[in-house]
């Protein structure tokens, strides 16, 4: 029996979907059709049917008491609740977000739900029954539906239902459903917005008419991109952001440069005209780049606030700038002037990435970069993504470029809120921008704006888009610009009259003409096919003493082998570390990993921060580094490099995600923005680095020549043929050597721990100077602990890096030497092992071996001085483990030919040309390697006559 209590109403706390559930449960309770939760059953027994004293207003302005039990409206209430949630979740399918379409084409789901409810049904249900936070003036469910349709199905459309965090979801819905997001703009701001659109349109049209046929990749059709960026930058500045980093491709870039980054029109025109004007291409390198690839840095001020805006230099490789700019932001956020990990302040900077609608789902680098967004080593506190969506990629329609409804759908998998907005509705676009920046500042996470417009012209201005999209371009031809649409709206609202609109247009035109008049005639007087590399780059890295006193090294080593009391180091690791205890004593030997740690510590003590990332970099792929220790009982971590004395620079080492391209781009960007930091990326195996080839090609090797963008990034690429097959043998040194020119980077393949120590310290010493350049290191695998690569303390404390080393105990009888063998890396160690084994019958008086430690720039003077000692030299041989069409041979061949002169022959010993880097049979590999070594050291062996496929001679 129901014991109805009328003094309190527990149902008041139930709203929306929760209320629908309670009503449904009461129906089951009354009919006995199913089991009801005991707690709810008790509530029903005490309080009866769910009922609400609410504001369904009657004719005499009194509130009626609404009870589902009395009206039989349970089913209808449930349908309304479901409809409300469907509008929130799927309203975007009804929204008018595409200016080239009259209406949305995905209406069936919501239409079906709405057709099941009459207006009378909706009027009978109180608003707060289905919407707890219904604003003032919303009384009935009908009002609710009208209001929510107005919010979710107009020029703005939202996708929030995939967001996992309920707090974020609630905040987002409250923001868009309240009046706070779309407060009417003041007349002053509306006029300013029209002026901005007039400037954007006027600039593009001026270029179109003045520089006919020249590529500019017009913004027209998504003109609102500029005001959207303006708004985000301004709101960021108001929140105290010091740096805003922008990454974008070429579409609309010139307009963004001219307006958001305030690049003078005269400078833009000078680049089109090939005229000399001071500062026109201020950030260009010696080879330069096309105008729509160049970046800019500018302090932007507005409304008494300012911030530095950086538009990153960018190649036409779409989206590859994304991780680079994220690296910029992280570097700007971190304080590296203390020991331990750097301090990150995510309020200092944020990133805006402008994507293309075809590139966002099409380029894998996008998802790789999105995956970095929540990772401790890479997160930057939230990126604002803007898809400049013109619904076509070159000539490819969207149905051929993606498998999803929206170009933004990829972002759903990363829990990113999405707003679609019609680019022909300027005020809606600004509302989207405001929501984006508020969300980023509050939740420190990514946000995406899908700015849907069109492309007024072809992919470039010489292209006729009507050839492939004839129907849509008929529409576009007759479609008014967003400036014209907004001008009409302001006139209709009485904000401006026609004369005032015309005055704004004329002012823009006069400004453009005036700036164009400042540009002198074209000047090709200095045009030349010979590009002059700056002297400081051309002369290369000068010799630098990089030794560290033995006492300092011993003190460092002691610190490296200590950890907090009670910290339980894994026994196997502890044993490895304890072996290093006496490494710096008189008879001690220093292996590769210890030399690295000693180099790191000494670099830190000199005030240079270090950042090292890569797959498995904390331990090291080959279980050699152990720079981060794990407590066996608590899994807490500890790095001795964080506790060493006399350090005032940060050290961070992170295991990266299973990505090469995004991580390389990120580390490159970090180093560009933190030039004082030794930034290192380590491949798990060098073989896998080629998935970042675009970054090596477009940024690391060429960034300074194209853009004047300096980097000292270090690439650690494990390399060496050990019979492990084609995926675990080669870092493809031939590719880095092919890209080597103009002293753009250093490529090395070292053979001792001391050499590694010195080259790291040399690299640290050139950071922040004009001599800086990237360092590409082919690092060892089996050589990490090889006896012939170990070094002594004196080798670390004295001298410097040597670009070439002579094999000890050879060449002692110069007049007898007939063959000079050059090799590098593991091949050189294999030769040394054979020489020192004493198990051969070669006449080693006739052979001398030189290890080329630094492949590029080639140490020609050093090698030439060695050659001059051997008056009876007959041949110079290059020996390598890679196939002939790989490795260093094709780089070395012309160098050897020049060194040899007319009287000395040159030759190659190694594997023949092959399509795969390495065979898969370790026994075959071993046999080949032994044959290469034997033939290289046996002067009597006439390999020019031999038909075996193990070596090839080339004169």
Curated annotation (Swiss-Prot):
* One protein family per Pfam: E1_dh
> For this protein, what is the EC number?
1.2.4.2
The UniProt entry, under SUPFAM superfamilies, shows:
Thiamin diphosphate-binding fold (THDP-binding) (SSF52518)
- Cellular component terms per the entry's GO annotation: cytosol; oxoglutarate dehydrogenase complex
Question: What are the names of the required cofactors?
Answer: thiamine diphosphate
For this protein, the record's InterPro entries field holds:
2oxoglutarate_DH_E1, 2oxoglutarate_DH_E1_bac, DH_E1, KGD_C_sf, ODO-1/KGD_C, THDP-binding, Transketolase-like_Pyr-bd
Q: Which reaction does it catalyse?
A: N(6)-[(R)-lipoyl]-L-lysyl-[protein] + 2-oxoglutarate + H(+) = N(6)-[(R)-S(8)-succinyldihydrolipoyl]-L-lysyl-[protein] + CO2
Key word Oxidoreductase present: yes
Enumerate the UniProt keywords alphabetically.
Glycolysis, Oxidoreductase, Thiamine pyrophosphate
Identify the enzyme class. Answer: oxidoreductase
Q: What biological-process terms (Gene Ontology) are attached?
A: glycolytic process; tricarboxylic acid cycle
- One MF term in the entry's GO annotations: oxoglutarate dehydrogenase (succinyl-transferring) activity
Q: Which HAMAP family match?
A: SucA_OdhA
Q: Which family does it belong to?
A: Belongs to the alpha-ketoglutarate dehydrogenase family.
Q: Relate the assembly described in the record.
A: Homodimer. Part of the 2-oxoglutarate dehydrogenase (OGDH) complex composed of E1 (2-oxoglutarate dehydrogenase), E2 (dihydrolipoamide succinyltransferase) and E3 (dihydrolipoamide dehydrogenase); the complex contains multiple copies of the three enzymatic components (E1, E2 and E3).
Q: In UniProt terms, what function does this protein have?
A: E1 component of the 2-oxoglutarate dehydrogenase (OGDH) complex which catalyzes the decarboxylation of 2-oxoglutarate, the first step in the conversion of 2-oxoglutarate to succinyl-CoA and CO(2).
Recorded protein name is 2-oxoglutarate dehydrogenase E1 component
Q: Which organism is it from?
A: Bacillus cereus (strain G9842)
């Amino acid at each position: 029996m129901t014991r109805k209590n009328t003094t309190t109403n527990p149902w008041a706390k139930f709203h929306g979907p929760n209320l629908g559930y309670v009503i449904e449960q009461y129906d089951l309770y009354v009919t006995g059709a199913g089991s009801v939760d005991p707690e709810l059953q008790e509530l029903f027994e005490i309080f009866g049917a769910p009922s609400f004293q609410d504001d369904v207003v009657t004719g005499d302005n009194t509130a009626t008491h609404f009870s589902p039990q009395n009206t039989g409206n349970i089913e209808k209430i449930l349908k309304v609740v479901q409809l409300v949630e469907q509008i929130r979740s799927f309203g975007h399918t009804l929204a008018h977000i595409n200016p080239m379409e009259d209406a949305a084409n995905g209406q069936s789901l919501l239409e079906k739900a709405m057709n099941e409810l009459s207006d009378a049904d909706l009027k009978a249900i109180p608003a707060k029954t289905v919407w707890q936070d219904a604003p003032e003036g919303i009384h009935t469910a009908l009002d609710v539906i009208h209001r929510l349709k107005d919010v979710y199905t107009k020029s703005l459309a939202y996708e929030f239902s995939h967001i996992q965090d309920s707090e974020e979801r609630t905040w987002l819905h409250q923001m868009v459903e309240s009046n706070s997001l779309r407060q009417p703009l003041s007349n002053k701001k509306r006029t300013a917005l029209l002026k901005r659109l007039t400037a954007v349109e006027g600039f593009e049209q001026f270029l179109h008419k003045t520089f006919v046929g020249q590529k500019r990749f017009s913004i027209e059709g998504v003109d609102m991109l500029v005001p959207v960026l303006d708004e985000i930058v301004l709101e960021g500045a108001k929140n105290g952001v010091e740096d805003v980093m922008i990454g974008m491709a070429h579409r609309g870039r010139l307009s963004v440069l001219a307006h958001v980054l305030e690049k003078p029109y005269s400078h833009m025109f000078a680049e089109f005209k090939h005229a000399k004007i001071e500062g026109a291409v201020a950030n260009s390198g010696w080879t330069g780049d096309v105008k729509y690839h160049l970046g800019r840095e500018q302090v932007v001020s507005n409304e008494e606030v300012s911030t530095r805006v950086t538009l990153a230099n960018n190649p036409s490789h779409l989206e590859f700038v994304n991780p680079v700019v994220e690296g910029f932001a992280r570097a700007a956020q971190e304080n590296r002037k203390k020991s331990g990990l750097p301090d990150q302040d995510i309020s200092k900077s944020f990133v805006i990435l402008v994507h293309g609608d075809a590139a966002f789902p099409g380029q894998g680098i996008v998802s790789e970069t999105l995956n970095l967004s929540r990772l401790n080593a890479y997160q930057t506190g939230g990126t604002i993504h803007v898809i400049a969506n013109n619904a076509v990629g070159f000539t490819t329609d969207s149905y051929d470029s993606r498998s999803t409804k929206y170009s933004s759908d990829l972002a759903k998998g990363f829990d990113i809120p999405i707003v679609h907005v019609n680019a022909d509705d300027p005020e809606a676009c600004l509302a989207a921008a405001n929501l984006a920046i508020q969300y980023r500042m509050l939740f420190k996470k990514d946000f995406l704006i899908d700015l849907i417009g069109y492309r007024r012209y072809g992919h470039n201005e010489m292209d006729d888009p009507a050839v492939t999209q004839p129907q849509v371009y008929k529409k576009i031809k007759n479609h008014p610009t967003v400036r014209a649409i907004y001008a009409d709206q302001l006139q209709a609202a009485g904000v401006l009259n026609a004369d005032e609109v015309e005055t704004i247009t004329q002012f823009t035109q006069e400004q453009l003409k005036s700036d164009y008049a400042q540009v002198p005639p074209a000047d090709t007087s200095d045009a030349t096919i010979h590009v002059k590399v700056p002297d400081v780059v051309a002369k290369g890295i000068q010799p630098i003493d990089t030794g560290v006193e033995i006492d300092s090294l011993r003190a460092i080593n002691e610190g490296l082998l200590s950890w907090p009391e009670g910290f339980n180091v894994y026994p196997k690791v502890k044993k490895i570390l304890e072996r290093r205890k006496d490494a710096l004593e008189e008879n001690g030997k220093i292996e590769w990993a210890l030399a690295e740690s000693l180099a790191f510590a000494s670099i830190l003590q000199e005030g240079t921060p270090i950042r090292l990332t890569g797959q498995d970099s904390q331990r090291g792929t080959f279980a050699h580094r152990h720079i981060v220790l794990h407590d066996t009982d608590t899994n807490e971590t500890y790095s001795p490099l964080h506790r060493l004395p006399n350090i005032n620079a940060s050290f961070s080492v992170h295991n990266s995600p299973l990505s090469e391209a995004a991580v390389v781009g990120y580390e490159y960007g970090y180093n560009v923005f933190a030039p004082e930091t030794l930034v290192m990326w380590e491949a798990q195996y060098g073989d896998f680095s080629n998935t970042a080839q675009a970054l090596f090609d477009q940024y690391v090797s060429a960034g300074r020549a194209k853009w004047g963008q300096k980097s000292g990034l270090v690439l650690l690429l494990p390399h060496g043929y050990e019979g492990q097959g084609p995926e675990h043998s080669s870092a493809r040194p031939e590719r880095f050597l092919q890209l080597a020119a103009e002293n753009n980077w250093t490529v090395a393949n070292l053979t001792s721990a001391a050499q590694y120590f010195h080259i790291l310290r040399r690299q640290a010493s050139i950071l922040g100077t004009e001599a800086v350049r990237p360092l590409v290191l082919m690092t060892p695998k089996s050589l990490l602990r090889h006896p012939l690569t170990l070094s002594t303390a004196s080798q670390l404390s004295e001298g410097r890096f040597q670009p070439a080393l002579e094999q000890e105990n050879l060449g002692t009888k110069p007049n007898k030497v007939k063959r000079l063998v050059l090799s590098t890396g593991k091949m050189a160690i294999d030769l040394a092992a054979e020489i020192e084994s004493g198990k051969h019958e070669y006449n080693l008086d006739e052979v001398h071996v030189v290890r080329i430690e630094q492949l590029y720039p080639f140490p020609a003077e050093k090698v030439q001085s060695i050659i001059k000692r051997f008056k009876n030299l007959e041949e110079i041989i290059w020996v390598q483990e890679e196939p002939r069409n790989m490795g260093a041979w094709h780089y070395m061949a012309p160098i050897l030919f020049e060194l040899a002169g007319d009287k000395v022959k040159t030759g190659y010993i190694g594997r023949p040309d092959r399509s795969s880097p390495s065979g898969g049979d370790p026994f075959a590999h071993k046999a080949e390697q032994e044959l290469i070594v034997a033939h290289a050291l046996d002067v009597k062996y006439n390999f020019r006559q031999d038909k075996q496929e193990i070596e090839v001679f080339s004169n």
